[in-house]
Amino acid sequence: MAKAKFERTKPHVNIGTIGHIDHGKTTLTAAITKVLHDAYPDLNEASAFDQIDKAPEERQRGITISIAHVEYQTETRHYAHVDCPGHADYIKNMITGAAQMDGAILVVAATDGPMPQTKEHVLLARQVGVPYIVVALNKADMVDDEEILELVELEVRELLSEYEFPGDDLPVVKVSALKALEGDKEWGQSVLDLMKAVDENIPQPERDVDKPFLMPIEDVFTITGRGTVVTGRIERGVLKVNETVDIVGIKTEKTTTTVTGIEMFRKLLDEGQAGENVGLLLRGIKREDVERGQVIIKPGSVTPHTEFEAQAYILSKDEGGRHTPFFNNYRPQFYFRTTDVTGVVTLPEGTEMVMPGDNTEMTVELIQPVAMEEGLKFAIREGGRTVGAGQVTKINK
């Protein structure tokens, strides 16, 4: 067997399995780990179905989600793969972004074709910005008629096109996860073919450090004789000393300034980058000019907005959420990055109310502007208690 060498430098990609219940998402996840373990034993451990299916519960912003994380490598890449046992877990994960996906494997049983949850997952993938999809047409061993397989493939492609994925062009690979898991050579090869399609069709994600600089402000203080310092964790990009930045959000006007010093653990740095907790010394800025909740950005890269559309998951009573539904004109706080801003909710036409445990689309109008882009995550809070989570799907103004 060809030996692939373990390289720390291999590109890292986050993927996950999505699709209707009982179409074989977890079986496929287990089959991928087995087949890759057999092909490259030095690189991969096989994960059994039971290990993946008994996913531990995680709490993300107070929301309980069962997510199984497995990792494996192909010859060219290192993958972190998420699989959720329950349908509700998928929805929560996709909306809250507990496990971000650079691409997804949509599992559709050839015996059933696309089903309601297939649709719901594809719609969510579109809304929450899962950028690429590869299709695994599973249980293909159970369909003898080639024409039926072709029809199901066509149906899946049409569904994907309907939600603005390139349905005509993306790969659809016929697999049998169960047969591959049982050690069948031919079906094992089908899973390797699927991973080759994933390698080739889910592009390398842009690294956080390569994106435009952004840091949410967590704290502001004055250092006598030096000026105003803001602290926070750099969300993305790189900042060098003496670069110009904009401070946006909360206030109506943006402020432009120069960063004259960058500190981490009381040491002066030439630059700060994504993931680091730093203090930034700002030229000519008074302490009252800036506040927690604003963001410091590469000039012009992000703008503040007050009205947006979102997809949100509302916590159930058991998760510590509301005990009662809410209606149009509901006014909670929306917690973006480091601060709460009150907003008014407009529900979609035909939605009378939203029950705890539901997921819903909504339009929100904030009382103060927040620096935002599509895909930005938020929590919905009432008096500091989280009652929901969501993400911005479209900016209106």
From Swiss-Prot:
Tree of life domain: Bacteria
Binding sites annotated in the UniProt record for GTP: 19-26, 83-87, 138-141
Region (G4): 138-141
Record keywords: Cytoplasm, Elongation factor, GTP-binding, Hydrolase, Magnesium, Metal-binding, Nucleotide-binding, Protein biosynthesis
Record domain tr-type G: where: 10-206
GO molecular function, one term: GTP binding
UniProt region (G5), positions on chain: 176-178
Chain segments carrying region G3: 83-86
Primary site of residence: cytoplasm
Keyword flag Cytoplasm: yes
Location within or outside the cell: Cytoplasm
UniProt region (G1), positions on chain: 19-26
Keyword Nucleotide-binding attributed: yes
Segments of this protein annotated with the region G2: 62-66
Function comment: GTP hydrolase that promotes the GTP-dependent binding of aminoacyl-tRNA to the A-site of ribosomes during protein biosynthesis.
UniProt name for this protein: Elongation factor Tu 1
Annotated source species: Streptomyces avermitilis (strain ATCC 31267 / DSM 46492 / JCM 5070 / NBRC 14893 / NCIMB 12804 / NRRL 8165 / MA-4680)
